[in-house]
């Protein structure tokens, strides 16, 4: 994907939680939110970091997912996705969801270094200008629920961490420019530390302040040691929308987007704006209203 006029803009949606058909009035509000934000922002890339829909107890979840993909596709803006813990809970698998995405989305960004590990897809989207890579977007499927009894949520697998280490090292330019951004659904455990250094936004999640896995497989350590990673943007916690910093790495929550999802923090999205010269990454939250 190419920079335009020295900039590249991403709009990140997360936790839209579309449910059963016919659509609930809250789902209609979420579609309207998507319309307003994409019309106002006109991004170069749309990112969705999971919990695109509820799948548990949802009849015809394949149709629900296809309708949502068709809704995004009408904008003819490239769409990149990863999945959350609710997308493939019941009746559908991640591979089936990827097939629907592939068949439905007509404007897909070019993925590189694609690897699927235990049905979890991981890939990179380079952002370029005149053939030169300027920034790298890493998409990691952070899984669903912990199946081993060590906590509530799954963790990024060691094999995925190794894929990230190898791929990010290959993309290094050795100029100390932090040009890599990771998108995934579930936060890494280091968010517990970084929430003590919030740059903007709120931390209002009450069940657990940070709904991270109990097992730490070293993804953050590899981000830090690489030296050229700006940070990570996740979803999952609907009442957290903060950007924070730990050891110079940004750990941020995107603003929750779906009106079917719990939480009193106003629904919206997060904008990531990347400037080439001088190189800079800025993020900001958009909130549509103060209602759930």
Please provide the spans of the model-predicted regions.
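Active-site environment of divalent metal-dependent phosphoester hydrolases
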Residues: 19-22, 54-57, 81-93, 145-148, ...
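Extended active-site neighborhood of metal-dependent phosphoesterases/phosphodiesterases
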Residues: 2, 64-176, 270-275
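N-terminal active-site segment of His-dependent metallophosphoesterases
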Residues: 1-69, 73
